[in-house]
Regions:
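Proline-enriched interdomain boundary motifs that mark the N-terminal boundary
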Residues: 2-10, 102-112, 205-215, 306-314
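C-terminal edge beta-strand
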Residues: 1, 89-100, 190-203, 292-304
Length: 349
């Protein structure tokens, strides 16, 4: 009777990534025709009993390895040949398959931090990823090489953090998208890496700029005269503005109008104030628009009263004889008047 002999010229030590096939190994069998295959730790689909057909003396071991390994695991398999009970059992071969896990990356900061919207010059809620299983590092890139100034990214062990403050004084909302790809174990480039993406949208600040002459923002006029038109331009995140009179000053100035036309805000009109002393009216203009902080500008309009002179006696026109004193004619200065000049008409004194 021929002896039970099992042999192979294949490599009995293999290393693969999860969810892949082992390197096929061809075995030769002599004497017996019953093959049993087992593995430890047990893999259900790996265990098998094979009966070789008559005249067949070879078979190939080619199995898929587990998909759910999270750490590198060594599996020891045993191939046993039986069948010729009259001969010594000499048909056992063992080998090992080292299975490496595929890569895994997980967002460990709050849900939604990987895609967030922030305002100019405000801090980003830190975005943190962690790798495990077959991954040990990161490749990071900003898509289209569009990099947000002030935002940084760094590795610390198995975590990757994106943080910082958006410092680019942009004019329109700008989206910065990024890609993070794991690095680590790679057997013949077949260990599956994992990629995550995210985005940071930066909103521009609400901007308002004086467009009229610098002297118009705080000006002085006389009552019942027109102010020099004050004009502001809205830009970036500002789409509108709210006007109010500053209560810290002298109240509301009648006759002044204000309004928005496109992106231009205009303050104009005639100071309709009946005042007896100088008054200063302060105004506040506050932007609105996107969700970023509003911007406020202020100015003042100082209104001066007209000069006023009042006759206090009833004898501004009188007739007297020569060398006779006149009755006193008395005038009072008020409101804007602080002095006087006197002249005789036609130089007749």
């Amino acid at each position: 009777y021929p002896s039970n002999v099992l042999s192979t010229t294949g490599d009995l030590t293999d290393e693969v990534c999860a969810n892949n096939s082992m390197t096929p190994i061809e075995f030769s069998a002599e004497g017996g025709n019953s093959i049993s295959i087992s593995v430890s730790p047990s893999i259900a689909l790996f265990n098998e009993n094979i009966t070789l057909a008559a005249g067949t003396t070879t078979f190939t071991l080619n199995k898929n390895v587990p998909t759910n390994v999270t750490t590198t695991t060594v599996y020891t398999y045993t191939v046993t040949l039986t069948g010729n009970a009259n001969c010594p059992a000499a048909g056992t071969i063992t080998g090992t398959i080292t299975v490496n896990p595929n890569h895994n990356i997980t967002l460990i900061s709050a849900i939604g931090t990987d895609s967030q919207t922030i305002c100019y010059n405000t801090g980003l809620t830190s975005i943190t990823y962690q790798v495990d299983q077959g991954a040990s590092g990161f490749d990071f890139s900003w898509d289209n090489n569009l990099i947000p100034p002030g935002i940084t990214h760094a590795v610390s062990g198995t975590t990757y953090t994106i943080s910082g403050t958006a410092t680019s004084d942009i004019s329109v909302a700008t989206n910065y998208s990024y890609t993070v790809t794991t690095t680590g174990i790679a057997i013949g480039n077949i260990c599956a890496t994992e990629t995550v993406t995210g985005s940071i949208t930066v909103l521009p600040r609400q901007a308002i700029t004086l467009a009229s002459a610098s002297t118009t923002e705080s000006q002085t006029i006389c009552e019942q005269t027109s102010i020099a038109t004050i004009t502001y331009n809205l830009s970036k995140g500002a789409t509108g503005a709210t006007f109010s009179w500053d209560p810290a000053y002298d109240g509301t100035l009648g006759g002044i109008t204000f309004g928005l036309n496109g992106s231009t805000y205009t303050i104009s009109g005639t100071a309709n104030a009946n005042i007896t002393s100088s008054k200063t009216y302060g105004y506040i203009l506050t932007t609105n628009g996107n969700t970023c902080s509003s911007t406020t500008v202020t100015g003042t309009i100082t209104v001066l009263p007209d000069d006023k002179i009042t006759l206090n006696t009833a004898n501004e026109t009188q007739s007297v004889c020569e060398s006779t004193p006149i009755d006193d004619v008395v005038y009072t200065l008020s409101e804007g008047a602080t002095g006087y000049s006197f002249s005789w008409d036609n130089n007749s004194i």
